[in-house]
Amino acid sequence: MLRKIILGASLIMAMTLSAQSQCKKGDCPHHSWMESNVWNNGWNVAAHSSINAKEFHEQYEKNREVWDAMFAYLAKIDLDTLSLGRIDIVPGRCYIKMSEYVPRESEKVNIEQHHNWIDLQYTLRGNEKMGYAKDVTVKHEYNPKKDVAHFNSDNVTYFKAGPEAFYLFFPTDYHQPSVIDGEPVTSRKLVCKIEYIH
């Protein structure tokens, strides 16, 4: 119990520091770095403007070989024809998973958070949106085996998901992926899991 309290307090502190340390787009070296695409290794898909550019930049620099391997792999394959399922890029440190599904209404989709993995989510086709939640309350406690905790919130900001940009969700991001946004059609989405360097 004490361990959970300490872990929770540490995470809240990290989230507060992360929010305080974000700089404004336009005068921020991290945003400039993200928009320069020097990190993409030939994968020409934009990073969505909602991404925490400071966290992205710092994680990339701490774990460059893994990020480079992932982006290089994404640049050389055809994501439209890639088989469904999981592929290890750097065993134990990065893998990708292609899936197809019909998104659901927000009330039926969990708000989630991970401690040890970063999510890159890229919707190739479908009518869906991604949510960032604030003012959350715990729905399901953190499960270390699945690296996920679930939350409730009435304060969620949504962004359209599509082939023009990918999203990154860090441990400081309470996110609600795969929410329906229009007609219920089948989505095709890539999720990349990248180890988070604490």
Question: What name fits each language-model region?
Answer:
Residues 127-161:
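A short beta-strand-loop-beta hairpin characteristic of the jelly-roll/cupin
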Residues 28-98, 108:
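A short, N-terminal "cap"/entry segment at the start of jelly-roll beta-barrel domains
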Residues 166-168, 184-198:
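A short hydrophobic beta-strand segment most commonly corresponding to one strand
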Residues 118-122, 158-159, 166-167:
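His/acidic/aromatic-lined binding-pocket segments of jelly-roll/cupin-type domains
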Residues 116-128, 144-146, 193:
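Short, conserved beta-strand element in jelly-roll/cupin
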Residues 1-28:
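Bacterial Sec-dependent N-terminal signal peptides
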Residues 160-179:
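Conserved metal-binding segment of the jelly-roll/cupin
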Residues 95-113, 124, 128-138:
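Conserved short histidine dyad/triad with adjacent acidic residue
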